[in-house]
């Protein structure tokens, strides 16, 4: 088949050259072969799929030196001024087999919170939506009817952070007076006792990954008091306290290989062994507070056993035994993780980002500069190939998720960009800003897809449901908005 495609293209007297396919990790596919210089991505797709010999042909994108082959190989080679006397390496990348469409309209404006909405989060399958607010409540919203479902009262101060367990059965919330509460989304009732111990407010929450423990028993919290605590949610007690940071811990990630990562205003990131709390290494390099960080595997960890490609119109709870869920979560994690360990990206008040391989090395892989103001949030795309960073400089920047190389700036907001969220297929990005708008960006085209005005004031929180159906946003106007295509 591959030979037939190449033969067919050989008719006519066109300049030809030798090319070699390889995957992102540098693994060669087949031997070098000869193609016409004007070969198109469609033809490359046929050849590459024939070599891969998959049952179902995969949608693929092709690159030469980071530049995508869009119209023909020749045009890309010209733009990159590549030596064509040598073998040209073409990198192939499988693309998501499903496609998320950009949201275009607000379908509901949900009132209920009496103060600003500080956080919004969809559950791992997209079945439930939760929000945390300055009015001290957590609210669950019914997505089939887009109406308020439960109002959860228990906190006595602003709810600053919320996080879903990866099985979607519990939501943890942390507040300004240092307490962590757990909620059942199907009843709106508190689960177990209030987890107390932190002396200052909660800055982040992160659950043990589903593939490590399908019971979703442990959750970690970070606080302005400089510590990280790991809680046993079944027993309702603190399992261990990780101390070592000298200032506020700003964010926290529970990785998929048994490590916990904490970032702090003391300018460091600490890597801990989750099961016994031993400090493995300290990552240094930032010149100011570390505000935000993300893992290359975040999306797989967040969604656990849920596969966005198999989403149905009405989101359901996950079905299957704990063993089956664990296996599904494990295979999804390993697919995104790839051969090397998970990567971490951190963003700081010093306007820079660093890319790390924290399981192996305390030196950064790359220092990423270009933002003109502090960085609010950084996120890897679900397929881990691109890093997006949102900043007070009004821009969102895109970077290569493996090398940290700068790719593009997305401009359009007229004030600080607070939060961003990826669509499950890694093709779109939504951003919420102090300018009161949301914007949806086409990442490949590096341009604005849709502009979503509607909020009356700053937008603090935004999330895109893992099933791709909805975007939720909240902010200073106390309103929760749901956007659909």
Curated annotation (Swiss-Prot):
Give the record's GO CC terms: nucleolus; nucleoplasm
For biological process, the GO terms are: hematopoietic stem cell homeostasis; inner cell mass cell differentiation; kidney development; mitotic cell cycle; negative regulation of mitotic cell cycle; Notch signaling pathway; positive regulation of canonical Wnt signaling pathway; ribosomal large subunit biogenesis
What Pfam families does the record tag this protein with?
NLE, WD40
Gene3D superfamilies per record = YVTN repeat-like/Quinoprotein amine dehydrogenase
What does the record give as the organism's lineage?
A: Eukaryota, Metazoa, Chordata, Craniata, Vertebrata
> PTM Phosphoserine: at which residues?
79
Query: InterPro entries given for it?
Result: G-protein_beta_WD-40_rep (IPR020472), Gprotein_B (IPR001632), NLE (IPR012972), WD40/YVTN_repeat-like_dom_sf (IPR015943), WD40_repeat_CS (IPR019775), WD40_repeat_dom_sf (IPR036322), WD40_rpt (IPR001680)
Cytoplasm as UniProt keyword: no
The subcellular location is: Nucleus, Nucleolus
Indicate the impact reported for residue 396 to S. Answer: In l11Jus1; embryos survive through implantation but fail prior to gastrulation. Cdkna1 expression is up-regulated while expression of several Wnt pathway members is down-regulated
Effect of a null allele = Embryonic lethality prior to 6.5 dpc with death of inner mass cells. Embryos implant but die shortly after.
Role summary: Plays a role in regulating Notch activity. Plays a role in regulating the expression of CDKN1A and several members of the Wnt pathway, probably via its effects on Notch activity. Required during embryogenesis for inner mass cell survival.
Any idea which residues bear N-acetylalanine here? 2
- Protein name, as recorded: Notchless protein homolog 1
Keywords, in A-Z order: Acetylation, Notch signaling pathway, Nucleus, Phosphoprotein, Repeat, WD repeat
How would you summarize where this protein is expressed among tissues? Highest expression in heart, brain, lung, liver, skeletal muscle and testis with lower levels in spleen and kidney.
User: Can you say where the WD repeats lie in this chain?
Assistant: 112-151, 154-193, 197-241, 244-282, 327-366, 370-409, 412-451, 454-484
User: Chief location of this protein?
Assistant: nucleus
């Amino acid at each position: 088949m591959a030979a037939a495609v190449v033969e067919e293209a050989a008719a006519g007297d066109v300049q030809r050259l030798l090319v070699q396919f390889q995957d992102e990790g540098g693994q060669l596919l087949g031997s070098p072969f000869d193609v016409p210089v004007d070969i198109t991505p469609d033809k490359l797709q046929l050849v590459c799929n024939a070599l891969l010999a998959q049952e179902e042909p995969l949608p693929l994108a092709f690159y030469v030196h980071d530049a995508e082959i869009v119209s023909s190989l020749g045009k890309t080679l010209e733009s990159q001024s590549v030596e064509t006397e040598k073998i040209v390496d073409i990198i192939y990348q499988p693309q998501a087999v499903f496609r998320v469409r950009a949201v275009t309209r607000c379908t509901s404006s949900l009132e209920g919170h009496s103060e600003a909405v500080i956080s919004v989060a969809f559950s791992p399958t997209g079945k439930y939506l939760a929000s945390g607010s300055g009015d001290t409540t957590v609210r669950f919203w019914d997505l089939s009817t887009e109406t308020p479902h439960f109002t959860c009262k228990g906190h006595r101060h602003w709810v600053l952070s919320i996080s879903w367990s990866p099985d979607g059965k519990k939501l943890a919330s942390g507040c300004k007076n240092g307490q962590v509460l757990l909620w059942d989304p199907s009843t709106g009732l508190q689960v177990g006792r209030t987890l107390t111990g932190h002396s200052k407010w909660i800055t982040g929450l992160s659950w043990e990954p589903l593939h490590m423990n399908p019971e979703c028993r442990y959750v970690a919290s970070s606080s302005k008091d400089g510590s990280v605590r790991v809680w046993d949610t079944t027993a309702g007690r603190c399992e261990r306290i990780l101390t070592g940071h000298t200032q506020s811990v700003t964010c926290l990630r529970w990785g998929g290989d048994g490590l916990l990562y904490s970032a702090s205003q003391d300018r460091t990131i600490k890597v801990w062994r989750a099961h016994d709390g031993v400090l493995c290494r300290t990552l240094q390099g930032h010149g100011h507070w570390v505000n935000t960080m993300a893992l290359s595997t975040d999306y797989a960890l967040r969604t656990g056993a849920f596969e966005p490609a198999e989403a149905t119109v009405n989101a359901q709870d996950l079905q299957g035994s704990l063993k089956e869920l664990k296996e599904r979560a494990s295979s999804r994690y390993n697919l995104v993780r790839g051969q090397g360990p998970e990567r971490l990206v951190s963003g700081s008040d010093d306007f820079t980002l660093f890319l790390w391989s924290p399981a192996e090395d305390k030196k950064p892989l790359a220092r990423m500069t270009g933002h003109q103001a502090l960085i609010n949030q950084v996120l890897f795309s679900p397929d881990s190939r691109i890093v997006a960073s949102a900043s007070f400089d009004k821009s969102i920047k895109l970077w290569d998720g493996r090398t940290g190389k700068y790719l593009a700036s997305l401009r359009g907001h007229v004030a600080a960009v607070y939060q961003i969220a990826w669509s499950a297929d890694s093709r779109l990005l939504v951003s919420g800003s102090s300018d009161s708008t949301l914007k949806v960006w086409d990442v490949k085209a590096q341009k604005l897809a849709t502009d979503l005005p509607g909020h009356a004031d700053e937008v603090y929180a935004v999330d895109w449901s893992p099933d791709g159906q909805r975007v939720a946003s909240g902010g200073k106007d106390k309103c929760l908005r749901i956007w659909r295509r």
